[in-house]
From Swiss-Prot:
A GO cellular-component term linked to this record: plasma membrane
The protein, known as: Biosynthetic peptidoglycan transglycosylase
TM ranges: 19-39
Reactions it catalyzes: [GlcNAc-(1->4)-Mur2Ac(oyl-L-Ala-gamma-D-Glu-L-Lys-D-Ala-D-Ala)](n)-di-trans,octa-cis-undecaprenyl diphosphate + beta-D-GlcNAc-(1->4)-Mur2Ac(oyl-L-Ala-gamma-D-Glu-L-Lys-D-Ala-D-Ala)-di-trans,octa-cis-undecaprenyl diphosphate = [GlcNAc-(1->4)-Mur2Ac(oyl-L-Ala-gamma-D-Glu-L-Lys-D-Ala-D-Ala)](n+1)-di-trans,octa-cis-undecaprenyl diphosphate + di-trans,octa-cis-undecaprenyl diphosphate + H(+)
Naturally occurring in which organism (per UniProt): Shigella boydii serotype 4 (strain Sb227)
Domain of life assignment: Bacteria
Pfam family of the protein (one): Transgly
Length: 242
């Protein structure tokens, strides 16, 4: 290898190492800060806003209103746990059994990819990372998930998740969603309304709360059954999530 190539390789390596150090410090600071402070915006919100501007849509506004857990109906927390991650109170960020099932499914059905992300993983991804399925992003997601699981309580993870989750075009967080679709604060959401919001979470830009498809309605009904099987509101109290 020539001296010039060695110099370029050395420069690139130093640059990447420094970039990783800067990002690690930034993310560690964010995890520490948002363990107590409200989250003003997420990486997904920034990505959606910038994408809208680049496509000439200057009317788009990624809107979110932060609320604490005592300002959110307990049905909402229960609904997302029932829909997305029923082992949330028990695991340490990763549901190994679900991951194994998803991998087996994806091997058999390459055109229908199934995910197995926990609420903790989704929170880390939505807050700090970009969209995508690359191994690099997955690795960063795993590290950030371990970070928030170590520093934050389960209640804090759920609170942040509910405040940054995407519920529609430009609608982020359960307070903005409750106001947009039901014209009420998140604290007043009913069991059925909470289940409907949770039903669109797999793809909130495709599935609509305002005009739910048959699939969304069937998923809402399934979530309601799962909420009942989990034990209803006492489930949240039992695991100190309310």
């Amino acid at each position: 290898m020539s001296k010039s190539r060695l110099t370029v390789f050395s420069f690139v390596r130093r640059f990447l190492l420094r970039l990783m150090v800067v990002l690690a410090v930034f993310w560690a600071g964010g995890i520490a800060l948002f363990s107590v402070a409200p989250v003003p915006f997420s990486a997904v919100m920034v990505e959606r806003q910038v994408s809208a501007w680049l496509h000439g849509n200057f009317r788009y506004v990624a809107h979110s209103d932060w609320v604490s857990m005592d300002q959110i109906s307990p049905w909402m927390g229960l609904a997302v746990i029932a829909a997305e991650d029923q082992k949330f109170p028990e695991h340490r960020g990763f549901d190994v059994a679900s991951i194994e099932k998803a991998l087996a499914h994806n091997e058999r059905n390459e055109n229908r990819i199934r995910g197995a992300s926990t609420i903790s993983q989704q929170t880390a991804k939505n807050l700090f990372l970009w969209d995508g399925r690359s191994w690099v992003r997955k690795g960063l997601e795993a590290g950030l998930t371990l970070g928030i699981e170590t520093v934050w309580s389960k209640k804090r993870i759920l609170t942040v998740y509910l405040n940054i989750a995407e519920f529609g075009d430009g609608v982020f967080g359960v307070e903005a969603a409750a106001q947009r679709y039901f014209h009420k604060p998140a604290s007043k959401l009913t069991r059925s309304e909470a289940a409907l919001l949770a039903a669109v979470l797999p793809n909130p830009l495709r599935f609509k709360v305002s005009s739910p498809s048959g699939y969304v309605r069937s998923r809402q009904a399934w979530i309601l059954r799962q909420m009942y099987q989990l034990g209803g509101e006492p489930f949240m109290q039992q695991h100190q999530l309310d």
